[in-house]
Design a protein with these regions (language model features):
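Feature activates predominantly on carbohydrate-active enzymes
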Residues: 1-195
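Substrate-binding cleft/loops of secretory-pathway carbohydrate-active enzymes
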Residues: 195-214
């Protein structure tokens, strides 16, 4: 059975590789066997320096080293990133602010509440999902596991801004499942098993059958 721990590496100081290894050591002591590492601006994504330039993000080399370290402790290290909702650090940049459900989001002053409640990607255009796929592909390459958590939670703004006409036509839940399905199929094609949170899909659980069996 999976005995896991979910580590949110996006709040406050970025945890160092040394500290993350200590987390793995403690997990091994308590016989936990899966660590999910959630990042946003705290990983050095290629071409997204606007998102992480004010931080000390984890590098690809550090992630690979942590993955190998966890494997020696019989811990599966699983990648996890935001792909849909609360993408504050990405969607508040000048280069990618136009991908937000609400325009000019990058001009708004920071607040923790706003960060969590808003900054959902605009699904009515194709540019957002292609960027997200590129981020997924880059991050998943650093892990030995066949699992990937796309999160897809807290999409509170979906259908309320740029995608409202589409939501009025198809329904908000249709927009949600179509977007998540495309990401899941992308992962399955890469040999991965997608995972995501159930807070949104549970409102219409019958839509789950549209997703890949993996």
């Amino acid at each position: 059975p999976v005995r896991g721990y979910y580590l949110d590496e996006t709040r406050g100081r970025v945890l160092t590789l040394s500290y993350l290894k200590q987390v793995a050591d403690r997990m091994a002591y308590y016989k936990l066997n899966q660590l999910q590492l959630y990042v946003e601006h705290t990983y050095l994504f290629s071409g997204l320096s606007e998102m992480w330039r004010d931080e000390t993000p984890l590098t690809a080399e550090e992630i690979r080293e942590l993955d190998a370290y966890c494997a020696k402790l019989h811990i599966e290290l699983v990648p996890s990133i935001a792909t849909f909702g609360h993408l504050y650090m990405l969607l508040s940049t000048k280069s990618y602010g136009d991908l937000c459900e609400f325009p000019d989001s990058w001009k708004e002053p920071f607040s923790f509440w706003d960060r969590m409640q808003h900054h959902t990607v605009d699904v009515s255009g194709g540019r957002a999902i292609e960027l997200i796929k590129a981020m997924i592909e880059e991050y998943m390459a650093l892990f030995a596991t066949d699992k990937f958590n796309i999160c897809a939670d807290e999409t509170f703004d979906l259908g309320k801004g740029k995608s409202k006409p589409l939501a009025d036509e198809k329904g908000v839940h249709r927009l949600y499942i179509d977007y998540v399905k495309e990401l899941c199929e992308f992962l399955v094609a890469k040999g991965k098993k997608p995972m995501f949170w159930g807070d949104i899909i549970c409102a219409q659980p019958e839509l789950i059958k549209e997703l890949p069996e993996e």
